[in-house]
């Protein structure tokens, strides 16, 4: 009879990559719950969301960092600081690239950042369904020549292909360590943060190109009512009056749809019925104002 191992492994893992390569999709696939905002627009991940995967033999704490890019405003500066700080404090880096994307200056910039750290790096080639096996081999060779990756693993974060293999490889790479979080905890962010992110995800998804990333969501109140329902009051912050009009929509239709979709996710998160009330407020140029960035939850000292 095979003796069960008593060794428990743990460690911190950072997920990095250019904007919109599937980092949040991967994190949510690994954890099994929606905790990192997903959108088809770049720069949707702003704060360093932590996802925690606990098994009988290991605990992995994942960091989902903003896409690495050249900052264009103070919010961009904040996002880049978060990404760079994360690389210094983890045991393993997962660098996600798209199988069908060309290697350009953005990829070169990230590899140069990786060369500044001694942390082991796994290269994850995502969206493998979009290329042929021959094309995939060319992508592997291309990256092999540029950096000594500890592992190169082709995956499909959306479909889940090869993700279990990836998790096993990560655990194998970790050293013996303590359990940092309770077994039933999947993130260290408070519920208010996750609820705000779920609402923001719906705004970005429904408004498509009309609303850029000048959107923040502030949770004003969360309160359990006598009837058992949870009341959530939230304000969507935009930079221009025209954006406010788009989010509210004709006769309030857009805001209503945002609310319905967000409420469904919030109910799944909280495990109870939710009454969601939304307001929209204009705060001009908030992304360049440090005091407002702090008010809306972007505090670089915490990261």
From Swiss-Prot:
KH type-2 domain ranges (all copies): 199-284
HAMAP family referenced in this protein's UniProt entry, alphabetically: GTPase_Era
Taxonomic path: Bacteria, Bacillati, Bacillota, Bacilli, Bacillales
GO cellular component: cytosol; plasma membrane
Name of this protein: GTPase Era
Function, in words: An essential GTPase that binds both GDP and GTP, with rapid nucleotide exchange. Plays a role in 16S rRNA processing and 30S ribosomal subunit biogenesis and possibly also in cell cycle regulation and energy metabolism.
Source organism, top-level taxon: Bacteria
Pfam families: KH_2, MMR_HSR1
Keywords: Cell membrane, Cytoplasm, GTP-binding, Membrane, Nucleotide-binding, Ribosome biogenesis, RNA-binding, rRNA-binding
Binding site for GTP: 17-24, 64-68, 126-129
Residue stretches in coiled coil: none
Recorded name of the encoding gene: era
Region (G2): 43-47
G3: region residues: 64-67
Oligomer and partners: Monomer.
Subcellular location(s) per record: Cytoplasm; Cell membrane
Gene Ontology terms for molecular function: GTP binding; GTPase activity; ribosomal small subunit binding; small ribosomal subunit rRNA binding
Region (G5): 155-157
Chain segments carrying region G4: 126-129
Source organism per UniProt: Shouchella clausii (strain KSM-K16)
